[in-house]
Amino acid sequence: MTRPASVLAGPKSRPPIHSQGDKTIEYAEKLLSVFILVPFAGSLIAIFFPSDQRGAISWFAGAIALVCFLVTAGLYPYVASGGVLHYRIDWVPELGLNFTLRMDGFAWLFSALITAIGVLVALYARYYMAEEDPVPRFFALFLAFMGSMLGVVLSGNLILLAVFWELTSIVSFLLIGYWHHNAHARDGARMALTITGTGGLAMFVGLIIIGKIVGSYELDAVLASGDAIRNHPLYGTVLVLVLLGALTKSAQFPFHFWLPHAMAAPTPVSAYLHSATMVKAGVFLLVRFWPVMAGTEAWFWIVGLAGLTTLLLGAYFAIFQQDLKGLLAYSTISHLGLITVLLSLGSPLAAVAAVFHIVNHATFKASLFMAAGIIDHESGTRDIRRLGGLFHFMPITATLAMVASAAMAGVPLLNGFLSKEMFFAEAIETHLVNPLDTVTPYVATIAGMFAVTYSLRFIHGVFFGRPPADLPRKPHEPPRWMRAPLDFLVLACLVVGIIPAQTIGPFLHTAVLSVLREGTPDYSLSVWHGWNIPLIMSFVALSGGIGLYFLMRSYLATAVEGPPVFRLLQGQRIFERVLVTLSWKWARWLEQRLGTRRLQPQMRLLVFLALAAGASPLLLGNFELPPLVIRGIDPAFALLWAIGIACAIGSAYQAKFHRLASLVLLGGAGLVTCITFVWLSAPDLAVTQLLVEIVTTVLILLGLRWLPKRIEEPVAAEDISIRVRLRRLRDLLLAIGAGGGMMLIAYTVMTRPLPETIASYFLERAYREGGGTNVVNVILVDFRGFDTLGEIAVLCIVALTVFALLLRFRPQSDSLEAPEQQKVQNAFDDDHPDRAAGDSVAEYLFIPAVIMRWMFPVTGMLAAFLFLRGHDLPGGGFAAGIAMSIGFILQYMSGGTRWVEERLRIHPLRWMSIGLLVATATGVGSWFFGYPFLTSHAQYASLPVVGKFPLASAILFDLGVFSLVLGATVLILIALAHQSVRAPRAHAKAARSDKEAVR
């Protein structure tokens, strides 16, 4: 999108949300945009750190997180009394997609958790990660995940929320699979991405429907439309879709099974993802939409049933885990179920308790994961059956872990006790008269008892009892700074548990006020509320949990991992069976019913479906064909197209047995198309078409070299079976139908009365606003730059896919044989003892090789020429990238793979990534001036000799296109060229090296 140069002189005006005199609020709002971009910028920088600089990169990541935390703390005064900070940039306003950031008290609380625990995890990871681990990749992903989570909690637009939501799924997939050499890590990452990603897509559909109901995707408008959403006929559909996203993210039943398998990630990842970030995103969404979707019976049943089941099963499963991280994973599932139950009740006090427990759980669970990591790091195992008596070896760590475990169990004078008491108090209240409401207090008490049992097992089974005898390493206290995050978190558990009103009270009130607004109830954070039913429930849970542990202690010390009743009912097994059924069994069934693995039946089916889809509306819609009008036809143009049609038909006819001839004819059809563009005054298209024809012809020729040979055997007409004749007739009819249909559609479109088009709009504004006279190029890189960005992203994906497919490809055995001409040349060398194998080849290619090497700088200059003139004359980044790739193709053809790669630094993946980043950064840069994404700036400069010439920021975008197109083409070229390196030489003497064979 383009703005005139005069408009771009100053920042975009926007009606201020606050008084214009309050400059500090305006600065605070602008700070939001910088605040959310800092982690992503840090992620890009972190990846370039050397692998051996573990300390430097950890301090860098910690500094990024600390800066974000300090900014969050500095913004608290603006939201403390119910205020809301906004920062908005129009992105794609036609679709309702704006880059809107919104910080209220609840978003502030989550931002503080994300950044504060991020600082502690960065410090902890400095000592946890091994020297051989790729630490730059870890911290780059860590910072990217921090930025993604901040994007989720600060999103003020539903579409933007969905974008960041899925980004958290993708980055968490990479973090969980960080140790990708481990099969468990790969499986856990795949499971997490599949479940949370699918739930996110369902949530995305629900958010779109909410936007349609409200009439806006802005979160402020949605939060003000609770009655409209709840009373809408699509409320049930929206509720299910949004809850699918929330329940899958927070590992609620029946989607809970992915979380324990995510424990294959490094412990710092577990401490971060499962305390303040990923799994909390689901309950964040429930709290965020609580004012507009809660309070209905459907909400109570769906959310409450999922939460109660998760609360009970998670606690029960945690008791029987033998892996420390597995125990903590299932306890996390249970506590998330507790929060979900609170949010299902529809009571404002329950919502307060839910927000409070989110904070409490983040502190004690992060500390427990860190303690488990220290035990694993210093002893070499996390198996509870092998541990015991560690208090004598690491007393400080043991004391800290015991306090955190007591907080998890809900022991008085710790933060977990306070929110658990609030949970019990709400559980005994009557919300809706139904069986689920009746059983809630009993389930809550039993789950609390189970929580005491698994917490006591963590304490007693690890730190007391018989000392360990066969540990991989002798246990000892960790480095001081590795334990420092644990010290801080446990201290927070103690301080909040003793003086909650003076510590967490103001921040909790700020968060609750932003969610409940005028419905905020009166509540107390006092440690002592007298003798009441919740206190009795706590006493029953504590005493019952202690008794249950000592009854089961001997069994748990030797038992197989997993609960006795549900040991065979494993979510992973069900998940794998579903995947196998969908991706293999059903695929094989469809393959048997619809065709074979051969390409021809598959293409036949695709053409038939396309023909049916295109013909159905024409046949059923009562369309009338336009009258056939034959106007004056230029004989030369008709002859040109007759040649092109003949080439196309000949190429298809010869494709099976005469591939080279078919390729030549295909190039002829492409050349006719190129001439047609010239004929119809489209030189830009003609230049691009010509360059693409050159490159694709050579690449296809390289690919044909490695296909199995096909020899045509003459068959008499009378020997062809009726079945074969019918099959050929069927294919002919399909081809005629599809081709005729396309011809009919083209004729209909071209003979319609020409309505008013947008061509005049582009013609009038291309030079004035885009700074270029080449309207086609200005459209591609300016007016429709967002489309071009998507297209080059697709090109990047295609190139990577081709490279991945050819990476393990090995040619057919019959394609390894040397060509006949090379056989003759090698035989001549064999007959002369004074000649080495390959001398004839080297002599034969010497002159072409020298000429092609001279052509390399020429093609480089041609590419630069096309690139620089593209804004005013035919050319541009795409054509320049193709032209530059021709230079590399010539070098590979003349010098061979090894010769070229020994002399040139060819990094196509780097070129592609730089191109995509430059193109995207060009669009993002416009945000800093208050304009929508990819808004360009154009002005004119004057030099003494050159004179007046245009300068447009779109040239940077075009540079990104050039880099990506060049990288993608060369990557495919390398994938094909490397087949010659992998394939063994048929001639024994020529097998010495590619270098000797072609130089």
From Swiss-Prot:
The chain crosses the membrane at residues 31-48, 63-85, 106-128, 138-160, 162-181, 191-213, 233-255, 270-292, 299-321, 336-358, 389-411, 442-464, 488-510, 530-552, 604-621, 636-653, 660-682, 686-708, 729-751, 788-807, 846-868, 878-900, 913-935, 955-977. It is found in: Cell membrane. It holds the Pfam family MbhE. The keyword tRNA processing does not apply. GO terms for cellular component: plasma membrane. Its main location: membrane. Residues 1-20 are annotated as: Disordered. One of its GO terms (biological process) is potassium ion transport. Keywords: Antiport, Cell membrane, Hydrogen ion transport, Ion transport, Membrane, Potassium, Potassium transport, Transmembrane, Transmembrane helix, Transport. One of its GO terms (molecular function) is antiporter activity. May form a heterooligomeric complex that consists of six subunits: PhaAB, PhaC, PhaD, PhaE, PhaF and PhaG. PANTHER family: NA(+)/H(+) ANTIPORTER SUBUNIT, NA(+)_H(+) ANTIPORTER SUBUNIT A. This is Probable K(+)/H(+) antiporter subunit A/B. It comes from Rhizobium meliloti (strain 1021). The gene is phaAB.
